[in-house]
Design a protein with these regions (language model features):
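Catalytic-core regions built around general acid/base machinery
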Residues: 262-283, 318-328
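Active-site core segment of subtilase-fold serine proteases
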Residues: 95, 100-211, 218, 223, ...
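C-terminal subdomain of the subtilisin-like protease fold in secreted/lumenal serine endopeptidases
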Residues: 39-41, 204, 240-248, 400-401, ...
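Short, surface-exposed ligand-recognition loops at beta-strand->loop->(often short) alpha-helix junctions
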Residues: 16-24
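Secretory targeting and sorting signals
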Residues: 1-3
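Autoinhibitory propeptides
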Residues: 8, 29-116, 337-338
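Extracellular S/T/G-rich loop segment that most often corresponds to the catalytic His/Ser-adjacent loop
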Residues: 146, 282, 309-420, 480-485
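Structural recognition of the beta-strand scaffold that forms the well-ordered cores
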Residues: 16-17, 40-41, 49-50, 141-145, ...
Length: 488
């Protein structure tokens, strides 16, 4: 748990201060104050604190403190810490009518909600058949570390764990579903894929009987800054979360280079928080990314820092994407309805553990997936402002849904399958990870990758290539997840 020490009003920058591993942070308040800052949160189990300061030399002064191994400003966008009051606007805005696509008959492969005929992704990984065995257990809790979730959505409300939900955007946990309300849409989409209820409304999630907590780390603009990521994993560890879904990379650096002092501090703090969660039995599942980068052989980062003007720089394997490249994290690449790798999905022989449906609007449009994307829940209040008109779907009940694509959509399928496994076996942590990677259908590297020539890596422009064997390769890992195998 974090302790909130001050409101830090008027501060211009947020800082992570990383003490040497297992060093006491009991003197952090005095040290931060002496350096011209205010202590915002203390994460004693991992020897990390969050501070705010307007002093230009704050980081330099903190690095000189005995026991401190790193201090770094995490963003130029200071996030307000206001003593616990986090505003949320859940009011409807605008007209949500749309020319929705025609809906095939429901009841496809055992999925029986009103929009189930549009769920090609669930059919592909045999979710309906799996539900004949188990729909998950309400004793299993998935923490969706994302932009929050719309706890009022009728397809999510039955399964939301209000007490385990939290807003971590500022680096200080503010508990409750109101604080965790989604102001972007992304988190509501991933939450629906994991745990939308089988209630006759809209769609069905992979594990519609488990509980889900909205752990809000991403702000309205979709940034996931280090203090929020640290807070989120510490919260998950201490609040009974079994599986976390992580459909993001931690900003502002796509690749955090451990040979750079500032980026090393960010990597260290985030890695410690993830490791702490893993030590409590939490399985961490994460998206590989949408840059078509080979994460096992990185050479260029043209994306970072993304909170200002990116600067192209040469990188190596000393640089890693958080959270997907943190040891023990299950990395997920994306597939489309033809069970090919999605054109945008990043990959890597040492990085991808499993593949899951994320959609592909260019190479993999089919009769079942006419626009190639994945349908899931969306806040009605944000539908007209954050979901393009052609992607909007309104259920007969008035509930809102949106089509999206990305490894962000793939990861929650894997997290949901992990939740099913946990429900039927009681497995946690490493044992759960191994079981998830066994519940797959292997997909070999394609013999011809020319279809991907139009979309080289966004970082460096390298052509996409696949390496490895049938049972472990850089595009699909062990294979595409299979929910029926998971519960069989």
């Amino acid at each position: 748990m974090a302790s909130s020490d001050a409101s830090a009003a008027g501060a211009t920058s947020t800082y992570l201060v990383v003490y040497k591993d297992k060093t006491s942070t009991s003197g952090a308040g005095k040290a931060v104050s002496a350096a011209g800052g205010q202590l915002v949160a203390t994460y004693a189990p991992i020897s990390v604190v969050v501070a705010r300061s307007a002093s230009a030399d704050f980081a330099v002064r903190m690095r000189a403190v005995k026991g401190v191994e790193g201090a770094v400003a995490t963003t130029r966008f200071a996030s307000a810490v206001d003593g616990g009051a986090v505003g949320a606007d859940a009011s409807a805005t605008g007209d949500t009518t749309t020319d929705a696509p025609s809906v095939p008959a429901n009841g496809v492969a055992g999925l029986n909600d009103s929009l189930s005929g549009l769920q090609w992704d669930m059919t592909q990984i045999k979710v309906g058949e799996a539900h004949a065995v188990s729909t998950g257990s309400p004793t299993v809790l998935v923490g969706d570390i994302d932009t929050g979730l719309d706890y009022t959505h009728p397809d999510l409300a039955p399964n939301v764990d209000a007490a385990a939900s939290v807003n971590c955007v500022s680096g200080v946990p503010v508990a409750g579903v109101v604080a965790a309300m989604d102001d972007n849409g992304h988190g509501t989409h991933t939450a629906g894929t994991i745990a939308a209820a089988a209630n006759g409304i809209g769609m069905v999630g992979v594990a519609p009987s488990v509980k889900i907590a909205g752990i809000k780390a991403g702000n309205a603009a979709g940034f996931f800054f280090p203090e929020a990521v640290v807070c989120s994993f510490m919260w998950a560890a201490d609040h009974g979360v079994d599986v976390t879904n992580n459909s993001y990379f931690a900003d502002p650096w796509l690749f955090n280079c451990r040979n750079d002092a500032e980026q090393r501090a960010i990597w260290t703090a985030e890695r410690r928080a993830i490791k702490y969660a893993q030590s409590k039995g939490v399985l961490v599942v994460a998206a590989e990314g949408n840059q078509a980068d080979d994460l096992s052989h990185p050479t260029v980062d043209a994306t970072s820092p993304d909170d200002t003007t990116p600067v192209t720089r040469d990188i190596s394997n000393a640089c890693a994407v958080v959270p997907t490249e943190v040891p023990g994290v299950v990395g997920v690449s994306a597939t489309g309805n033809k069970q090919m790798k999605s054109f945008y999905s990043s990959y890597g022989i040492s990085e991808v553990d499993v593949a899951a449906p994320g959609g592909d609007s260019i190479l993999q449009q089919t009769a079942a997936a006419p626009n190639g994307r994945v349908l899931s829940t969306w806040p009605a209040s944000l539908l007209t402002s954050t979901c393009l008109p052609a992607r909007r779907v309104i259920d007969a009940s008035g509930a809102a849904y949106c089509y999206q694509q990305g490894t962000s959509m793939a990861s929650p399928h894997a997290a949901g399958v992990a939740a099913l496994i946990a429900s039927v076996t009681g497995k946690t942590g490493g044992a759960l990870s191994a079981a998830l990677q066994d519940a797959v259908n292997p997909i070999p590297c394609p013999t011809d990758v020319s279809a991907y020539a139009f979309f080289p890596a966004l970082d460096g422009g390298a052509a996409q290539t696949c390496e490895g064997t049938l049972t472990q390769n850089s595009w699909f890992g062990a294979g595409e997840i299979d929910a029926l195998k998971a519960v069989g």
